[in-house]
């Protein structure tokens, strides 16, 4: 999980695993600091797993919720393509594609007008993706996925943290369950994650995307 992928297809399963781990740590912290109830489980329902029995017992001392929600969000990450769909909904993908890929390519081609949605789609599907796939120097591609992978890991964690904190806030306001921790600390964590994601994007993802675009030969554009 710590070694970055070299392609989008390599990234996906690694992203789902990373989401499981970051979510587990996050929900474990929520239970420890009084933001979520400790929901136990009867030991007879735990299957015997050789060499991991003590570890599993330790995990379940924090209740079933951290492991259950980690599995849930990991499945959501894969089944619903969480990072990609949320990025599209809030406009990150549109900004990323338009300003870091499509406009620079259009400028090289001498096109100054705004492209239509259909033209933008063709630039991405018929030019950018095929040409990047055919690049002989894979160094730029690998550097790109090195940075993008970590961006998506923290992006998915930010989405999950935001939804979770929102639900915990509603639970505290409606007395759905006992929340002893400060909501201010939770929202500060979410804001910090958003700021960190923005920093990763500006400092790493943006220059790597621009560098990759520059590798496309002018005569292909």
Regions found by a protein language model. Give the residues of each.
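Loop-to-transmembrane boundary segments
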Residues: 9-23, 116-172
């Amino acid at each position: 999980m710590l070694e970055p992928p070299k392609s989008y297809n390599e990234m996906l399963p690694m992203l789902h695993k990373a989401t499981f781990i970051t979510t587990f740590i996050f929900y474990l912290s929520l239970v420890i600091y009084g933001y979520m109830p400790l929901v136990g489980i009867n030991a007879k329902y735990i299957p015997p797993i050789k060499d991991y029995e003590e570890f599993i017992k330790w995990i379940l001392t924090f209740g079933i919720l951290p492991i259950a929600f980690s599995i849930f969000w990991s499945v959501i990450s894969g089944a619903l393509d969480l990072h990609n769909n949320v990025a599209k909904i809030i406009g990150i993908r549109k900004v990323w594609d338009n300003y870091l890929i499509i406009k620079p390519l259009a400028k090289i081609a001498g096109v100054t007008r705004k492209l239509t949605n259909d033209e933008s789609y063709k630039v991405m599907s018929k030019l950018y993706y095929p040409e990047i796939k055919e690049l002989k120097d894979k160094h730029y591609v690998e550097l790109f996925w090195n940075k993008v992978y970590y961006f998506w890991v923290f992006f998915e964690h930010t989405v999950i943290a935001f939804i979770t904190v929102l639900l915990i806030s509603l639970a505290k306001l409606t007395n759905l369950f006992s929340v002893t921790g400060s909501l201010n600390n939770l929202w500060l964590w979410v804001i910090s994650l958003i700021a960190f994601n923005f920093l990763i994007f500006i400092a790493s993802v943006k220059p790597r995307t621009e560098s990759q675009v520059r590798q496309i030969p002018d005569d292909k554009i």
